[in-house]
Amino acid sequence: MKEECDILIVSNYYDPELGAAPKRISAMARGFVERGNSVRVLCPMPNYPKGRVFGGYRNKLKVREFIDGVCVDRIFIYPSKSQKPFVRLLSMLSFSISLAFYLPFLNVNRTKLILIQSPPLFVSFTAVFLSNLFFKRKICLNVSDLWPQSAVELNVLKPG
């Protein structure tokens, strides 16, 4: 598969992780491929739901693999399931920082659409900002969850 792609998806979750978000994003990427598009997914090393990088991906800064015709670039994340707000914040910020170093160097000459999955807020903000700054391509921000939930999980807001 070539370096270039028609559609770039930036997501915090992707197969083989468990849960609705990785399954939904994976199905969407496969659907784009089935319709004749080349697709690249940029995501962190798989770590959800346990907050530990899965075996085979540990101690790596970048892994490229092909799953069902989709080019998947996995980059560094500091994963955590800690209940401490600072540690959770650090975990969320780590993928955004990795994006800041990786995204500007992608070859997007042929890319027609950049689809950014949100939440988390930091990832979507970083991806939208850098995509607008460097690429000038159509951006679709897919908000699949309530943003206040992120604040509840960080203990910044209380439920209810």
Question: Model regions: which residues?
Answer:
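Active-site loop signature of alpha/beta-hydrolase-fold enzymes
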Residues: 16, 47, 80, 146-149
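N-terminal subdomain of nucleotide-sugar transferases
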Residues: 1-68
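Active-site-proximal region of nucleotide-activated glycan assembly enzymes
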Residues: 137, 156-160
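An aromatic- and histidine-rich active-site surface loop
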Residues: 88-103, 111-135, 141-144, 149-150
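Glycine-centered short loops/turns at secondary-structure junctions
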Residues: 36, 135-136
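Short acidic, glycine/proline-rich loop/turn micro-motifs
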Residues: 83-87, 151-157
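A conserved catalytic-core segment of Leloir-type glycosyltransferases
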Residues: 43-106
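Hydrophobic residues in well-ordered beta-strands that form the structural core
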Residues: 9, 41, 74, 141-143
